């Protein structure tokens, strides 16, 4: 028996409907901010991802060569592809661009709960705005999208200017080593690394910055930074907008990627793999041959959101099972067409069952049975049976449709 590839999943109808219902809530949340959906190819030129992340990322990617000898990769994330699309298709479009996406990505890593080789991201990119209000809007947008799902989570917001100010005397390689320790909260390893660099004096400042939770503390620890007013404005806008967050100036990922504001979101019940949101301000376009445009965005790990939510019950459509005899089939086909035109799911028997067997099947799969025999067909009517209450009525098709719709509205 052929099995699905490791790290992938099948979604049966109930789960798929639950996923679509949560996805729809997120889409509606970002739509209200004016963000419009875009779509990029599932595979891109390999260079799109190695330019920013280096050749090492190839170990985590699905890479292949096509028949023309081109090196391609299944996308491991969406942001780079969206910026590539901006350069190719929308460089002269009026700014800012408010784009969102929902798409699957692929990474070759060890599968575990909340981590898959094929996974879905919901995200947004704001391209061409470089203000405190732009930073704040993207954070508010991410918060609205996650709050719409009903997931229980916490938002942490920081700014890399503080960390960069403390690490200014270190070369990029040394900065990455320090940030790796901070990312893992490995303070013992941090102290050893700084001692080896003869920078032990930084240890107390870095540890204090990671642990501080107010702007005043952060400014006191890191000293004067050029972005002081911008940071204060961003946090002020978030406060005025009622966004619930905590400050975290120890966010240590992406020091060589993000340019300023950064934020992360964590679900309360996912254990070690609890990050469901990551985002911040960045500049990527110039790496891909475009202008040096300011951008800000985020990605939500949709699969982890679904795991955190647990069992989700999507609203179910009312289903009408069309039950008919051979003599009533022509009229039944017409009635089914009317039900569907009215937006009601109508299912006909395809198995050649008798009337009793059709009713038995409908009782397991439908809310109403629309029974049509020769008598009903001759009279242009149907016998509508509520399969939950057992109540049945003889009605014309329009009245039956109204009855079923009224049930669905309750």
UniProtKB/Swiss-Prot annotation:
Per UniProt, subcellular location reads as: Cytoplasm
Keywords of the record, alphabetical order, are: Aminoacyl-tRNA synthetase, ATP-binding, Cytoplasm, Ligase, Nucleotide-binding, Protein biosynthesis
Instruction: List GO BP terms, alphabetically.
Output: histidyl-tRNA aminoacylation; L-histidine biosynthetic process
The reply to whether Aminoacyl-tRNA synthetase figures as a keyword in the UniProt entry is yes
- Which SUPFAM superfamilies does the entry link to? Class II aaRS ABD-related, Class II aaRS and biotin synthetases
Which NCBIfam families does its entry note?
hisS
Q: What is this protein called?
A: Histidine--tRNA ligase
What high-level taxonomic lineage is stated for the organism?
Archaea, Methanobacteriati, Methanobacteriota, Stenosarchaea group, Methanomicrobia
